[in-house]
Amino acid sequence: MESPDLEPQQRTLDDASAEVVSADEVEFDVETDVLVAGAGGCGLTATLAACEAEDLTVTLLEKSAEVGGNAALSTGMIPAAGTRFQREVGIEEGPADMARDILEKNGHEADAELVEHLCESSVDLVHWLVDDWDISLHLVDDFKYPKHSEYRMHAPPGRNGENLVAEMRDRIEARANAELLTNTPVTKLVAKDGAVEGVVAGSVREEAIRADRVILATDGFAGNREMVRAHCEDDIADALYYGSDGNTGDGIRWGAELGGALASMDAFQGHATVVSGTGALSTYAVVMNGGVLVNADGERFGNESKGYSQFAVDVVRQEGGVAYEIFDERIFERLQGALEDFDRAVDLGSYTSADTVEELAAELGCDPEATREAIESYNAAVEAGEPDEVGREDGRNVLSAPFYGTEVTGSLFHTQGGLVVDEHARVLREDGSTVDGLYAGGGTATGISGHGAAGYLSGNGLTTAMGFGRLAGVHAARSLGEQS
């Protein structure tokens, strides 16, 4: 019988508990040195890092048919401060600048030392991907995401995460000491005396795999509505989920069963501009090049430049959970051909155009006169160089005919809380001790976004996914090398 005084967070974890079995009850079928669970941004990076040790075997298991997870659904942009790509265009900044932006966005609610460590390692991460693994990345220097003080996003071709994960997958498949298996979910962790000794995995037929080190890269729990309702704010719990179906909290539950501490379980990344009719993502570059959002009454309802994650909740709170994105031909032409997400949205017929704001609003379904007044007020503030009626000052440009627009809804992308880890991505207990042999990264680990949606800075997801992934892979391989 459930204890009546059990904390709600623990109750949810217990109710949906993933199984951890004793090594005494398992007969292992195969062995590997490093086992990585989950082939998203974190798992792919961890595998690349670990398999650099050529005398080790590395096994990467993915529950879905395709690799990539949420990284494949993202723009694939990796923030890094102090790279040679920045210096080549005259940008002089360092990790401390990136850390400052992250901490200011999350209200200094994240672990400052961990934030600083990830920012310091971001430079090596980008250079390592490009130089050691021939991953195609370039600096994005034509627009900044909200609250980034400098151009520091390093993007794959097309600014599309599918292209990033495809290259990473190809590099792994070319390694003799690495094995990638899809449609192979990890179903249980195997442990003895609090230390991880392997996993049980498989869909049609399960096998027990002995592993000296296990890296949990199963992302968060945004695809598990029960966990979302238990931990995140009500407004987002029933919002559209725009993420990988495999993100059901498995790794978090396994780690917690072994005594791993949890933090920031209420943190998540939302997105304010998923197109209602087509389900396409209307890139936030539309907004940061001057686009605005109004509600059904034709009124601006908040400062869009505070970020697509935080603004997602504002959109969900509008009538019908929708808003209307208004921009112009200048923005349309600037983004077409530059971002694959935008091109996909265009190809799906996501956008409507008209010669006047009133005509556009009438077609979209928001109040024509009020929308015209909102755009006129916005333009006047831009021309005067003053904050507009919602306090926005960033990413503004005068909007002029012809106009474009679409109906959008707020969505949940992924959660940002999970297992507490150290600077090597090792899972920690409440007393600060490590769970032997166990690592976590990405959405499986505590993120750097503080609480709720407001603390998410663009790129935080891949910062923790790929940053912790590399740290975990390097440490796992190095620690095994020291034992040999």
Identify what each model region corresponds to.
Residues 1-34, 52-53, 481-482:
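Extreme N-terminal leader/targeting segments of oxidoreductases
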Residues 11-12, 16, 118-208, 223-227, ...:
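Conserved redox-cofactor binding core of oxidoreductases
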Residues 28-32, 204-213:
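Core beta-strand elements of the Rossmann-like FAD/NAD(P) dinucleotide-binding domain
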Residues 32-60:
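N-terminal Rossmann-like FAD-binding beta1-loop-alpha1 element of flavoenzymes
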Residues 53-73:
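Glycine-rich FAD pyrophosphate-binding loop
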Residues 188, 370-452:
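A glycine-rich dinucleotide-binding beta-alpha-beta segment and adjacent secondary-structure elements
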Residues 209-273, 462-465, 471:
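Glycine-rich loop(s) and the adjacent beta-strand/alpha-helix scaffold that form part
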Residues 252-254, 260-366:
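An anion/pyrophosphate-binding glycine-rich loop and adjacent beta-alpha core
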